[in-house]
Amino acid sequence: MGDNLKKRSSMTTDGDNRAPNRAMLRAVGFTDEDFHKPMIGIASTWSEITPCNIHINKLAEKVKEGVREAGGVPQIYGTITVSDGIMMGHEGMHFSLPSREVIADSIEIVSNAMRHDGVIAIGGCDKNMPGCLMALCRIDAPSIFVYGGTILPGNCDGQDVDIVSIFEAVGKFNAGKISREEFIRIEQNAIPGAGSCGGMYTANTMSSAIEALGMSLPGSASMPAVSSRKANDCYEAGKALINLIQKGITPKQILTKKAFENAITVVLVLGGSTNAVLHLIAIAKEIGVGLTLDDFDRISKKTPHLADLKPGGKYAMTDLDKVGGVHGVMKYLLKEGMLHGDCLTVTGKTIAENLKDMPDLVPNQTIVRKKSEALHPSGPLVILKGNLAPDGAVAKISGLKKISITGPAKVFESEDDCFNAIMTDKIKPGDVIIIRYEGPKGGPGMREMLAVTSALVGKGLGEDVGLMTDGRFSGGTHGLVVGHISPEAFDGGPIAIVQNGDKVTIDSSKNLLQVEISQEEIDKRLKSWKPIEPRYKTGVLAKYVKLVQSATNGAITNLL
């Protein structure tokens, strides 16, 4: 180990003119020897506000041990997190997607300011993963992402339960399908401890995508948060980063177009969240890779859905981990010719080299099917276009018996109005709900609609109504739902001029989203449309509205 690995930090520590800088570093524990070692930033998203992140600092300490062992000098620093589960269904959800940008900005600021020679970012809750990756792309020093890990399932009356169980219980209780006592028991047992929400929801979707991208160590994505394996994953990541610095490998060499195609394939096979579309496009833009909705559409049409995972399926991430994990799935996909095996990873080796000596999926398991027995012959994430979404929209069809609907529009100007209508039985089978002015600018922040969709499922309407929005959906959502409609209502997209009673069609089999009125009538209504005032005039959300781009561009705020 030598000064030649200090390509960035040398400007902070080397030479007589940097004596004041070194004096400050001595006060935080640096020794004479440390000034000759690469400086490593460890970005921790630890927080007491959410179970997804409450254990992260313990993991950061294990990363620190690995860095020290391999000859680096580690520095743990903090960034923010919010809790999507706790923010869901109220005003706080406006801040979820903007938190992704703050995470990215803050990691970029600290590690570029300190001139860290390498960075390890540790994330737990949903926006941590893309926020961390976006920052690592901007810094483009040798980097690794470590996932905090998935939560263990809760147990209620002998049944596995999780965060979606209690969201759906709200609708069931309102409909009189469960007693108050059962409702309370589900609440008390749904979240047993540390870790991210346990199905193939957004956090686990993004951890899987990041492993497929090659930016985390093999096996990292599916390990439980509370396990010796996860602690060792962190320790090994610390050591692996020094190897990356020695080899001079940075995210720009790893995050190629083929790497993103691998990530999309894995997300589709696993039945991942619609949020993966938004976040992968955002990450790709940060690293300079051209990724669009058309890429998702192209790959989805040839990629089968194989994993029977929640929310549309039966199993949790811990179940997948027991039968071989995400790396086991990737090994199967590589054998089937569905992945680019020559993509470089943070081990310094290729995907194919990493998977060569890793175990196959457990024989005769029922969680991940073979291609010949696919749950669906194409991917569950569907890109729709039409006169309601000229720039595109995203639907998820996993676990659905019905993938199309035509019915009268029930229009709401916010999520809150729609939720109240559901809970007061104003939504009927056959309706197509439209929730607008919830886009990146209009919301602002593209609120997730888990409270709404879970209420529909709890009320028994999940298969009988359609729902479309310029907002987003939680990874825990299931039902005939379409999000990310672009252009959004705030920008004068056609969703802004739909009226109650208009006949509206969602047809996932034809990739179609349209209102059954003439183009002449659409143009007439658009001419008389007037934009709404931004809902926030001061503070971070007011700033966000001025910077954020459309969902088709990943809702990024970087000035690219």
From Swiss-Prot:
It comes from Leptospira interrogans serogroup Icterohaemorrhagiae serovar Lai (strain 56601). One of its GO terms (biological process) is isoleucine biosynthetic process. Signal peptide: none annotated. Gene3D superfamilies: IlvD/EDD C-terminal domain-like. The gene is ilvD. InterPro entries: DHAD_IlvD/Edd, Dihydro-acid_dehy_C, DihydroxyA_deHydtase, DiOHA_6PGluconate_deHydtase_CS, ILV_EDD_C, ILV_EDD_N, IlvD/EDD_N. This is Dihydroxy-acid dehydratase. PROSITE patterns: ILVD_EDD_1, ILVD_EDD_2. Keywords: 2Fe-2S, Amino-acid biosynthesis, Branched-chain amino acid biosynthesis, Iron, Iron-sulfur, Lyase, Magnesium, Metal-binding. SUPFAM superfamilies: IlvD/EDD N-terminal domain-like, LeuD/IlvD-like. It catalyses: (2R)-2,3-dihydroxy-3-methylbutanoate = 3-methyl-2-oxobutanoate + H2O; (2R,3R)-2,3-dihydroxy-3-methylpentanoate = (S)-3-methyl-2-oxopentanoate + H2O. It is an enzyme of class 4 (lyase). Its cofactor is [2Fe-2S] cluster; Mg(2+). Pathway: Amino-acid biosynthesis; L-isoleucine biosynthesis; L-isoleucine from 2-oxobutanoate: step 3/4; Amino-acid biosynthesis; L-valine biosynthesis; L-valine from pyruvate: step 3/4. It comes from the Bacteria. Mg(2+) binds at residues 84, 126-127, 448. Functions in the biosynthesis of branched-chain amino acids. Catalyzes the dehydration of (2R,3R)-2,3-dihydroxy-3-methylpentanoate (2,3-dihydroxy-3-methylvalerate) into 2-oxo-3-methylpentanoate (2-oxo-3-methylvalerate) and of (2R)-2,3-dihydroxy-3-methylbutanoate (2,3-dihydroxyisovalerate) into 2-oxo-3-methylbutanoate (2-oxoisovalerate), the penultimate precursor to L-isoleucine and L-valine, respectively. The active site is at 474 (proton acceptor). It holds the Pfam family ILVD_EDD_N. GO terms for molecular function: 2 iron, 2 sulfur cluster binding; dihydroxy-acid dehydratase activity; magnesium ion binding. Disulfide bonds: none annotated. The modification N6-carboxylysine is found at residue 127. Homodimer.
